[in-house]
Amino acid sequence: MGNTLLEQLCDQSSDTKTTTISITDQKSITHPADENAYNGVGSNAEIRFNPNENPSLITQNEISKQVQQEGRPAYIGLAHELIHGMHINSGAARPKTIKLQSITTINGEKYLETLPLEEAITVGLHGVTSKGPTENKIRCNSQDLF
């Protein structure tokens, strides 16, 4: 899956867009150069990547189904940002926000969990389809390597 991601980013067709990576000590983020990131035309992308960022993520073990907080290795974080870059380059980035699920707090208050659609697709959340690389597919493939 990682090879597919790199092949798509390195596509040498005549209308190739570029993805530039720079190192930052801030939160990792990927920005499109313009609105063509969302309309099928495609745009150049800029990734600002922090290799020391290690966010704690709610993760479910595929075998045991146990949910726990886990850090994210730097290579997974970079893959996540590169997937955003791939979407931006191809014009397939999604600006919408989606409703994930209704959550009830301990106090009985209910609220609707929302997430940018682009994040849900990039991560590969259950119920959000993506034929291409996702963070979760790369996680699964990388577990076979280590």
Language model: regions and residue ranges:
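Polar/charged alpha-helical tracts
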Residues: 7-8, 65, 109-110
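Active-site scaffold of zinc-dependent metalloenzymes
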Residues: 19-76, 85-89
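A metal-dependent hydrolase signature that marks the N-terminal structural subdomain at the beginning
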Residues: 1-30
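Active-site or metal-binding loop neighborhoods of secreted/extracellular toxin and effector enzymes
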Residues: 72, 86-146
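Conserved beta-strand->loop/alpha-helix structural units within folded catalytic cores of enzymes
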Residues: 80-81
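Acidic/proline-rich low-complexity IDRs
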Residues: 4-8, 56, 99, 144
